[in-house]
A protein has these predicted regions:
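Sec-dependent signal peptide recognition
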Residues: 2-8
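Residue-level detector of transmembrane insertion/anchoring sites
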Residues: 8-9, 173
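Hydrophobic h-region of N-terminal signal peptides that target proteins for export
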Residues: 9-17
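An exposed, glycine/acidic-rich loop-and-rim segment of catalytic or binding clefts
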Residues: 18-357
Length: 357
């Protein structure tokens, strides 16, 4: 195995199942990506700014142990599922049977799969090379209340075009909800540096999904017209985030799903975020119908990044491509039930660069 790829190896005992958690670094051009198979987490993405200075642009930790025993954000850099985002009431129905999932959010709901979601499991490494890693996980029938043995394969690739590409594939032997996403927190000036309120954001969406006080979708698919959620043209994130808008109050800022204006079933433009200070930008492309944009409203500086800087309020953002939240309880939302004989697929591309301005 390539010595430039594997940079450390350690053993963990997690949930009574001993596996090895490895750390890998991939390289392509002037971009490097460090991941661990514990939760299929992104630990760092190093890219140049407009002056050529190389810096990690996602919030992370130096060691796997810090992810196993987090002092703050549990989902930092993780793959989340089997159902990303929230399940209202921690329950859903499939084929006439009601299933109950763990309550780990606001005292009533399930967030990102539960306590033992895929972010808290050690994935098997199928293959690894300088620019790609393939991970596999079996999520057994009944774990955290989800039906079916869910077989998952995920490929992380650094392309020659300076892109971080994620490809998901899943199958099941019993009908079950499936909606994976990834949770890197982007800090385009480096960990703990500056505020995302200064970032310029554009989202390809004419509608978004309003939420209640527990961040559960109300069932409405609302137009962004005339609201602080209209990013069809670029706006500074901080321009309207402090408005007296009930939706912003509910989430303490932005933490909502935008319904992407898709024209095909393939990979299309989702959003573009740029930082005027570093010149860095990240552009997101995906084949999924939704984007959860979270403006880092609950970071408080208690947790530190891999560079030792505190991860403060709104110092990073999450851009999560996915199907719509709580879709399993909303028949009018994009369907999330995977049946035997079907394949769940999902492609997300994070394209990095430096603005010419």
């Amino acid at each position: 195995m390539n010595k430039a790829v594997i940079i450390s190896l350690l053993a963990l005992s997690l949930f009574s199942c001993e596996k090895k958690a490895n750390v890998y670094t991939l390289h392509s051009g002037n971009t490097s990506l460090t991941v661990t198979n514990y939760g299929a987490r992104v630990m760092s993405i190093v890219t140049p700014d407009k002056y050529g200075i190389m810096e990690n642009i996602v919030a992370g930790h130096k060691t796997v142990e810090e992810y196993v025993h987090p002092v703050g954000e549990r989902f930092l850099g993780a793959c989340v599922g089997p159902v990303a985002n929230r399940i209202g009431g921690a329950a859903f129905e499939v084929d006439g049977e009601v299933y109950h999932t763990p309550i780990n959010d606001n005292g009533h709901n399930t967030l990102h799969g539960g306590f033992k979601g895929v972010d808290n499991l050690i994935w098997d490494v199928v293959s690894v090379c300088d620019t790609a890693i393939v991970l596999h996980l079996l999520h057994p029938d009944g774990l955290e209340g989800y039906p079916g043995n869910l077989e998952m394969t995920m490929t992380y690739t650094l392309t020659s075009a300076g892109e971080f590409r994620i490809d998901y594939l899943a199958t099941t032997d019993k009908a079950t909800p499936v909606n994976f996403s990834n949770h890197p927190f982007f800090c385009l000036r480096g960990e703990g540096n500056g505020s995302v309120e200064d970032y310029l954001m554009q989202i390809n969406a004419s509608h978004y999904i309003p939420i209640d006080a527990e961040s559960i979708p109300t069932g409405e698919i609302a137009p962004v017209d005339g609201t602080p959620f209209d990013f069809r043209e670029p706006h500074l994130i901080g321009e309207r985030i402090g408005m007296e808008d009930q939706q912003l109050i509910n989430a303490r800022g932005y933490d909502h799903n935008w319904c992407i204006d898709k024209t095909t079933d393939g990979v299309e433009f989702v959003c573009h975020v740029s930082d005027p200070v570093s010149g860095r930008f990240v552009e997101v492309l995906s084949d999924q119908p939704g984007l959860q944009f979270y403006s880092g409203n609950f970071f408080d500086g208690h947790e530190k990044g891999s560079n030792g800087n505190p991860l403060g309020f709104r110092s990073s953002i999450a851009l999560e491509t996915q199907k719509w939240p709580d879709a399993v309880n909303h028949p009018d939302f994009t369907p999330v039930i995977l049946k035997p004989g079907e394949q769940y697929t999902h492609t997300c591309i994070y394209r990095f660069g430096v603005s010419e301005e």
